[in-house]
């Protein structure tokens, strides 16, 4: 259904899930946890889709209101996913996707290992896909340039150990 309604969002979600699963496998996460990471990767932006459906019509929102709505998307995604029993673990990952390793993220200001491991993994895969994807206002970066940016974010935005795992996983992804 998502592929028909929002094909770009669906393609992004698939790429994020693929990168996140590869990273989770690189650190030998048990299969049930890899499955949770995959589910959360596929559904990580469901809150954005719900907000866009309710609030973005023919006229696009800009500025502060747009920023406020975007910041709410992880809470909305959590609310949607947490009512489905087999997606509750994914919900707890989705709500933490914009937490930062240094504690300056949102919504709870979690830092370091307080952030669920799945969220730390998906945050990197999500950032990488955003950096490498071309959109209306900019061209996507090369894989190498995007990985340089990911490395720059280690210790502030991202878990340094997961950045190292991402780099190993992305090498494998490029070869496949």
What are these regions (language model features)?
Residues 1-176:
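Histidine- and acidic-residue-rich, metal-dependent catalytic cores
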């Amino acid at each position: 259904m998502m592929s028909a309604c929002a094909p770009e969002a669906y393609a992004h979600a698939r790429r994020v899930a693929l990168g996140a699963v590869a990273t989770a496998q690189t650190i030998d996460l048990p299969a049930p946890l890899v499955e949770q990471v995959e589910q959360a990767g596929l559904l990580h932006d469901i809150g954005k889709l719900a907000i866009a459906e309710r609030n973005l019509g023919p006229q696009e929102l800009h500025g502060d209101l747009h920023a406020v709505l975007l910041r709410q998307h992880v809470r909305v995604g959590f609310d949607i996913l947490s009512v489905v029993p087999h997606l509750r673990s994914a919900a707890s990952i989705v709500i933490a996707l914009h937490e930062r390793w240094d504690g300056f993220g949102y919504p709870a200001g979690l830092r370091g290992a307080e952030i669920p491991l799945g969220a730390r993994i998906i945050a990197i895969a999500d950032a990488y896909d955003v950096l490498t994807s071309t959109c209306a206002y900019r061209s996507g970066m090369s894989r190498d340039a995007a990985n340089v940016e990911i490395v720059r974010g280690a210790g502030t935005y991202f878990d340094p150990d997961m950045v190292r795992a991402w780099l190993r996983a992305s090498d494998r992804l490029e070869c496949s």
